[in-house]
C-alpha cells in the first residue's frame, strides 16, 4: 500500500507545483496588471471545468475501482463515462469561450476585458481537463500509480521547459503552451 500511495503523493506534489508555476513565472517577468488578467481568466475557467470534473470524479473513481476485476466491463463503462463527460464538458467550456467577452463584462466589468483572449484559450484547454482526469482515474483504479506518476512528471517537465522557452513571446503564447 505504501509504494502505491507514495507515488500518488509525489504525483500530487508535481501537480501542485505545475499548477502554480505559471503564475510564479508571470509574476517574475510580467506586470501585475498582466498577472491580474491571467488570474481572472484562470479563475473563471477553473470554476467551469472544476464543476464538471468534480461531478464526474465523484462517480467515476468508485465505479472504475469496483469494475477493475472485469476488464471488458470496465472498458465499456469507461467508454460510456467518457462520452458523457465529453457531452457535458465540450459544450460547456466551448460555450464559455464563445461568450467570454460578455461574461467578463457582466461578471466583473469591462475593465477586465483584456483577460478575454486568455480565458478563451484556457476554456478550450478546460474542455479536455475532465477527460484527462477520467484517464487518470482509470490508471489509478488499475493500480498503475507508477505510470500515472511518471506521466505527470514528464508532462510537468515538458511544460516548464516550454514555458521557459516562450517567456519572451507574451502571455497568450505562454497560455497556449502551458495548456
Question: What are the functions of these language-model segments?
Answer:
Residues 78-130, 159-168:
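Alpha-helical transmembrane segments of multi-pass membrane transport and lipid-handling proteins
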Residues 16, 43-46, 93, 102, ...:
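Residue-level recognition of pore/gate-forming positions within transmembrane alpha-helices
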Residues 41, 45-89, 136-141:
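Helix-loop junctions and terminal segments of transmembrane helices
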Residues 7, 22-24, 34-53, 83-87, ...:
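Alpha-helical transmembrane segments of polytopic membrane transporters and translocases
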Residues 146, 153-179:
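Membrane-interface helix-loop junctions in multi-pass transport and translocation proteins
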Residues 1-20, 33, 59-76:
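Interhelical loop/hinge segments that connect adjacent transmembrane helices in multipass membrane
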Residues 16-47, 62-66, 101-111:
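Helix-terminus/linker motif at the lipid-water interface of multi-pass membrane proteins
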Residues 33-36, 79, 113-116, 145-146, ...:
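Residues that define the loop-to-transmembrane-helix transition and helix capping
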